[in-house]
Amino acid sequence: MSLTEEIKKRRTFAIISHPDAGKTTITEQLLYFGGEIREAGTVKGKKSGTFAKSDWMDIEKQRGISVTSSVMQFDYAGKRVNILDTPGHEDFSEDTYRTLMAVDAAVMVVDSAKGIEAQTKKLFEVVKHRNIPVFTFINKLDRDGREPLELLEELEEVLGIASYPMNWPIGMGRAFEGLYDLHNKRLELYKGDERFASIEDGDQLFANNPFYEQVKEDIELLQEAGNDFSEQAILDGDLTPVFFGSALTNFGVQTFLDTFLEFAPEPHGHKTTEGNVVDPLAKDFSGFVFKIQANMDPKHRDRIAFVRIVSGEFERGMGVNLTRTGKGAKLSNVTQFMAESRENVTNAVAGDIIGVYDTGTYQVGDTLTVGKNKFEFEPLPTFTPEIFMKVSPKNVMKQKSFHKGIEQLVQEGAIQLYKNYQTGEYMLGAVGQLQFEVFKHRMEGEYNAEVVMTPMGKKTVRWISEDDLDQRMSSSRNILAKDRFDQPVFLFENDFALRWFADKYPDVTLEEKM
């Protein structure tokens, strides 16, 4: 098969949702259909011994939450599918946002009882900004939920995207009977031995069933007043195809997967800082690091840089340019994933996600190129911390483990490190409290380094230039520090302290992001 044909087989997408909408469960079912697991791990309770395949970190298994993006790959129906299962918890939005830079489409999972929730809206806005296609799966039809028409209306009003139902539920909760499949023009049956039936048999199958009569009325209304189906509008991110189903009972998921792969886009190009778009079908290899993960194999204390291949083909042992440093690197120890499981690969193509063994060479956002190509892809999003804590080792004899743990976990990008300019104390910044809990858990579990964490009462951070640096600017309301790149910053206790500082030192430029 030619390189072009291989690239065109790739379908790379992320699954996004509010916590507990069923995102990880649907991921499990997709892996089941892809033949990667024998049964979906539908149990996520910490008292059970069965856990979601994509939740590989100990804290995820203990607390039943996803706190890091997982990468999974399988072959299905002639396509190579790359799934990125993202954390739904808002504290980990930075990891999720970066992951969304590495995909060509998104699957948005919505709880039928709750509709569009806060985190779903946040993540959708990122996807919308990139104009990538969004496929919607309205989940939990095996439970009572809101009316389908109401859910479609909310999609359009809250998210501002047109919708087109690919199927329609017949009943809900205990009265759930199946799906009226508008795209494939058939009925998908929830009960009984037969999985499908023709639409012509519907009146006989559901004789005197008020829910089926309501379905026919709803569909007639949609055909008269609903949006027209347009494959181009889907690819442009202007129309979301909507699928109903139940991930927990694995109903409607395979139909969704089949139809998704029919309309999901091939790998797309990425913009460089100069405004050019790198064609995925170009011969020369290029890619970017969108995530760094330490201790995927705790026995070896390793670190993996996740790279989205943008163009060309990776071959084992190839040399690349690391544009940020201007130095070369050799890609020899490279893997692909099934959550924490991995296997060595000798080649991969545009659209694929590979893991490069990292000894400290790479940073999130790095661009990799070959030959004379020295461009950089557009920078990944960064976030300003809102909570700060002092951190120190509980046992001074564990200094070495403490420093190694901090170095590796900070490089993942979910938490930021600062060092007090005057005292040398370490301080951490995060978007949410859960990030500190995960940090503490991982320091103790993965590095055997217990830590003491103390709230600081600081709420925001601003960067300044070296030229403006003056230690006399420090006061009780702000702390002068350096970030992990040795750039000077001020940590302020509140917005009032920030405004007071800006008024007192009008010539000092305060940057919200480095």
From Swiss-Prot:
Its main location: cytoplasm. The keyword Ligase does not apply. GTP binds at residues 17-24, 85-89, 139-142. The keyword Ribosomal protein does not apply. It is found in: Cytoplasm. Residues 8-268 form the tr-type G domain. SUPFAM superfamilies: EF-G C-terminal domain-like (SSF54980), P-loop containing nucleoside triphosphate hydrolases (SSF52540), Translation proteins (SSF50447). GO terms for molecular function: GTP binding; GTPase activity; translation release factor activity, codon nonspecific; translation release factor activity, codon specific. GO terms for cellular component: cytosol. Keywords: Cytoplasm, GTP-binding, Nucleotide-binding, Protein biosynthesis. InterPro entries: EF-G-like_DII, EFG_III/V, G_TR_CS, P-loop_NTPase, PrfC, RF3_C, RF3_dom_3_sf, RF3_GTP-bd. It comes from the Bacteria. GO terms for biological process: regulation of translational termination. NCBIfam families: prfC, PRK00741.1, small_GTP. Belongs to the TRAFAC class translation factor GTPase superfamily. Classic translation factor GTPase family. PrfC subfamily. Increases the formation of ribosomal termination complexes and stimulates activities of RF-1 and RF-2. It binds guanine nucleotides and has strong preference for UGA stop codons. It may interact directly with the ribosome. The stimulation of RF-1 and RF-2 is significantly reduced by GTP and GDP, but not by GMP. This is Peptide chain release factor 3. The lineage of its organism: Bacteria, Bacillati, Bacillota, Bacilli, Lactobacillales.
